[in-house]
């Protein structure tokens, strides 16, 4: 996969944006470095990256060691939700990643593990519960395969979010992460 990405980047297609997982982004950045270049010098100026292994530590590492000034935003999502963007993160908040669903299309709640009708308090851990509503589709209260901590609204996103996203503990032992 990395060989294909390098071939595409070297082909002169003026590609500036990419979607990837942290593991693939790191592999690509290291490959480019071994070739004497960087993500930014290869033409990439913006990156959407997501996956349950996207931690504040990795976010900091990517910004300090891999990106060479390219913009990256952590993302979280799936086909039912769409793409949840993160609130701004960086040194000001220790690279914390808090995701906010793309309302009004989708809304997430962080609910009690034993009672999916009870929303946990801010900072508390629970399972992700998703409601999706589009012109074509309505999916109320779908329990996702993820868990995390409930985050309060922020200036950019005036609704609840989630941080610390990871596989739901009931499935964690059998969940593969990293390449989707």
Which residues does each PLM region occupy?
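Active-site glycine/GP-rich loop and adjacent strand/helix microenvironment
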Residues: 1-180
């Amino acid at each position: 996969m990395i060989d294909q990405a390098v071939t595409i980047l070297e082909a002169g297609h003026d590609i500036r944006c990419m979607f990837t997982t942290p593991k693939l982004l790191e592999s690509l950045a290291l490959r480019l470095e071994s070739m004497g270049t960087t993500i930014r010098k290869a033409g990439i100026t913006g990156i959407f990256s997501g996956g349950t292994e996207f931690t504040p530590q990795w976010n900091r590492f990517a910004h300090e060691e891999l990106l060479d000034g390219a913009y990256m935003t952590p993302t979280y999502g799936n086909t039912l939700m769409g793409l949840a963007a993160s609130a701004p993160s960086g040194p000001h908040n220790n690279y914390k990643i808090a995701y906010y669903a793309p309302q009004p299309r989708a809304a997430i709640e962080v609910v009690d593990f034993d009672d999916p009708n009870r929303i946990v308090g801010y900072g508390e851990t629970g399972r992700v519960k998703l409601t999706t509503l589009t012109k074509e589709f309505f999916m109320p209260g779908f329990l996702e395969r993820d868990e995390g901590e409930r985050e309060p609204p922020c200036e950019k996103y005036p609704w609840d979010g989630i941080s610390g996203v990871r596989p739901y503990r009931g499935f964690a032992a059998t969940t593969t992460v990293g390449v989707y």
